[in-house]
From Swiss-Prot:
May play a role in DNA repair. It seems to be involved in an RecBC-independent recombinational process of DNA repair. It may act with RecF and RecO. Keywords: DNA damage, DNA recombination, DNA repair, Metal-binding, Zinc, Zinc-finger. Residues 81-176 form the Toprim domain. A zinc finger (C4-type) spans 57-72. Belongs to the RecR family. It comes from Actinobacillus succinogenes (strain ATCC 55618 / DSM 22257 / CCUG 43843 / 130Z). This is Recombination protein RecR. Gene3D superfamilies: 3.40.1360.10, 6.10.250.240, RecR Domain 1. GO terms for molecular function: DNA binding; zinc ion binding. One of its GO terms (biological process) is DNA recombination. NCBIfam families: recR.
Length: 200
């Protein structure tokens, strides 16, 4: 039996989500059509709103609907002198849930990966350099993932900070090597923050 082109299109587009293969996408599509059409319409509206209205914070580059995000706008955080560098916006959420950090952030949107053509400019290190030059930070905390690429990125940023005589530390590796911040439990992340060490 030939299925509907619209259904095939829905299944194909659901596959763009991480971890969703052909079978999972098909189950999702059939569930929405058979049991939850109003939920499907709400999902479509939420996706449309998010895709059209959410951009990047002009200071830290996380996701926001405003020019600057709530964290960057917070006066107490502006005077903390602490900057935490993370790879992805989801990493901010993971760190915020621990309640261990009261400074500001900078999101790289990735990590250095020369083999994939991702150099310093592609992850916004020129913008980070400007922030370090224009704002007063007494410590930069590197919270990149404990991977080869994350380590290389952290070392590159550490050099940038040391050239400006800014204290630089890296969160401790209570996080499993090869893991990603957004999947780590709060206790492990708390220990990692409390056990961070200075580089250089």
């Amino acid at each position: 039996m030939q299925s509907s082109p619209l259904l095939e299109n829905l299944v194909e587009h659901l596959r763009c989500l991480p971890g969703v293969g052909p079978k999972s996408a098909q189950r999702m599509a059939y569930h929405l059509l058979q049991r939850d059409r109003s939920g499907g319409m709400n999902l479509a509206r939420a996706l449309t709103d998010a895709m059209s209205k959410i951009g990047h914070c002009s200071q830290c580059r996380t996701f926001t609907e405003q020019e600057t995000c709530a964290i960057c706008d917070n006066p107490r955080r502006q005077h903390s002198g602490l900057l935490c560098v993370v790879e992805m916006p989801a990493d901010i959420q993971a760190i915020e849930q621990t309640g261990q950090f009261s400074g500001r952030y900078f999101v790289l949107m990735g990590h250095l990966s020369p083999l994939d053509g991702i150099g310093p400019r592609e992850i916004g290190l020129d913008l980070l350099q400007q922030r370090l030059q224009n704002e007063h930070f007494h410590e930069v905390i590197l919270a990149t993932n404990p991977t080869i690429e994350g380590d290389a990125t952290a070392n590159y940023i550490a050099e940038m900070c040391m050239q400006r005589n800014i204290k630089v530390s890296r969160i401790a590796h209570g996080i499993p090597v090869g893991g990603e911040l957004e999947t780590v439990d709060g206790t492990t992340l708390t220990h990692s923050f409390l056990g961070r060490r200075e580089l250089g």
